[in-house]
């Protein structure tokens, strides 16, 4: 049996479970069509001569799940691609203890769960997986509506109109003059009567003392 076919068969028969030895990030990612995606698998053990495999599962994990072998990283050969894989879209490289799966120009059919895996003796060790969702349009977040503030209306009192022209009409002016004349006449009469009374009092006193 060819090694790659054996690998796929082993992945089908092995119970799939997340392991702390291989930590995958992020757990979920949603990207737009034709974008680039980088999935990380960090090994918590020394993998000097061990290969890291990347598999894809297009449906939710189950007993009938099918795993596609995409590529592996080999310390001597670098990236080795699986059969019927677009090699120009998939690359695997190492960055210290992390193994990166790089996907370019992703399409909606690339959506699925991506697992990194190492082959032990005899067990297989899987990461917890990264779910990739490729969509044509990313959802837009609605902007919070701003409350409109009501402006207070300022009531302004009408300005008093300045009177143009003469302040007093001729009739009013005539009445004022007449009133002044009446006061003067009354004052003159009062003074005259007062003087006459004084003279009469003086004459009476002179007659009394004779």
UniProtKB/Swiss-Prot annotation:
Isoform 1, isoform 3, isoform 5, isoform 6, isoform 7 and isoform 8 are expressed in both thymus and peripheral CD8+ T-cells. Expression of isoform 1 is higher in thymus CD8+ T-cells than in peripheral CD8+ T-cells. Expression of isoform 6 is higher in peripheral CD8+ T-cells than in thymus CD8+ T-cells. GO terms for cellular component: cell surface; early endosome membrane; extracellular region; plasma membrane; receptor complex; T cell receptor complex. Disulfide bonds join 41-116. PROSITE patterns: IG_LIKE (PS50835). Keywords: Adaptive immunity, Cell membrane, Disulfide bond, Glycoprotein, Immunity, Immunoglobulin domain, Lipoprotein, Membrane, Palmitate, Phosphoprotein, Secreted, Signal, Transmembrane, Transmembrane helix. The keyword Disulfide bond applies. Residues 22-132 form the Ig-like V-type domain. GO terms for biological process: adaptive immune response; cell surface receptor protein tyrosine kinase signaling pathway; immune response; T cell activation; T cell receptor signaling pathway. Integral membrane glycoprotein that plays an essential role in the immune response and serves multiple functions in responses against both external and internal offenses. In T-cells, functions primarily as a coreceptor for MHC class I molecule:peptide complex. The antigens presented by class I peptides are derived from cytosolic proteins while class II derived from extracellular proteins. Interacts simultaneously with the T-cell receptor (TCR) and the MHC class I proteins presented by antigen presenting cells (APCs). In turn, recruits the Src kinase LCK to the vicinity of the TCR-CD3 complex. Forms disulfide-linked heterodimers with CD8A at the cell surface. Interacts with CD3D; this interaction couples TCR-CD3 with CD8. Interacts with LCK. This is T-cell surface glycoprotein CD8 beta chain. It comes from Homo sapiens (Human). The lineage of its organism: Eukaryota, Metazoa, Chordata, Craniata, Vertebrata.
């Amino acid at each position: 049996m060819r090694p790659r076919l054996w690998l796929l068969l082993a992945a089908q028969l092995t119970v799939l479970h997340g392991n702390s030895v291989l930590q995958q990030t992020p757990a979920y990612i949603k990207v737009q069509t034709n974008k680039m995606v980088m999935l990380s698998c960090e090994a918590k053990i020394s993998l000097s001569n061990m290969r890291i495999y990347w598999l894809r599962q297009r449906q939710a994990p189950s007993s009938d799940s099918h795993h596609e072998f995409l590529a592996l990283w080999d310390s001597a050969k670098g990236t080795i691609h699986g059969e019927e894989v677009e090699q120009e879209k998939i690359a695997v490289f190492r960055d210290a203890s992390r193994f990166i799966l790089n996907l370019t120009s992703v399409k909606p059919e690339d959506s699925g769960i991506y697992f990194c895996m190492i082959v032990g003796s005899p067990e297989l060790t899987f990461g917890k997986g990264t779910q990739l969702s490729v969509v044509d349009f990313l959802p837009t977040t609605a902007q919070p509506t701003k409350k409109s503030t009501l402006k207070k209306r300022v009531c302004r009192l009408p300005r008093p109109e300045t009177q143009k022209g003469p302040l007093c009409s001729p009739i009013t002016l005539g009445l004022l003059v007449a009133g002044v004349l009446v006061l003067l006449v009354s004052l003159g009469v009062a003074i005259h009567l007062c003087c006459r009374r004084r003279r009469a009092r003086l004459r009476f006193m002179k007659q009394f003392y004779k």
